């Protein structure tokens, strides 16, 4: 195990340890634009009595930390981790949905007015990706995604620029 090889004692071996964060970020930079997705690490505190509440709390926090930092794939050591992964994924998407919906709707309004000189396509793309991941995970419905003003077919392109180009054609 990586953290053990780094000399980190068992009580502090978890995916949010700085050694793990640095290793993941180095991998992210090294693999940028290759299509390789990095997965979060597992929580080593198993949800078995008497540790169930503490294990679920740690796992929920670990998964949430990974999602907040852009790691959308994960794996778990124990089937008892699945409820907290499910809860963390849904909580992540549902908590960010209102702001993402408003921002994406506003991005398209501003982009359509700006014409060819739109500065922040990367953020628009990140919001399209967010909504597609939320839909794929089941955290939101197509009706909730439609609150952005995008049609299901526009969102399914997965491309902010394709949507923008299609609207200006």
What are these regions (language model features)?
Residues 1-169:
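Expand to "…catalyze enediolate/carbanion chemistry for C-C bond making/breaking, isomerization
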């Amino acid at each position: 195990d990586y953290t053990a090889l780094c000399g980190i004692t068992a009580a502090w071996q978890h995916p949010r340890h700085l050694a793990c964060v640095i290793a993941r970020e180095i991998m992210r930079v090294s693999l940028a634009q290759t299509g390789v997705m990095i997965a979060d690490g597992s929580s080593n505190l198993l949800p078995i009595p008497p540790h169930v509440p503490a294990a679920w709390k740690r796992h929920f926090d670990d998964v949430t930390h990974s999602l907040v930092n852009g790691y959308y794939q994960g794996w778990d050591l124990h089937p008892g981790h699945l409820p907290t992964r499910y809860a963390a994924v849904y909580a992540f998407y549902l908590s960010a949905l209102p702001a993402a919906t408003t921002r994406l709707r506003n991005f398209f309004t501003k982009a359509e007015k700006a014409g060819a000189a739109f500065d922040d396509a990367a953020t628009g793309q990140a919001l399209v990706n967010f909504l597609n991941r939320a839909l794929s995970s089941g955290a939101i419905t197509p009706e909730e995604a439609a609150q952005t003003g995008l049609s299901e077919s526009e969102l399914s392109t997965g491309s902010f620029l394709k949507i923008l180009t299609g609207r200006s054609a």
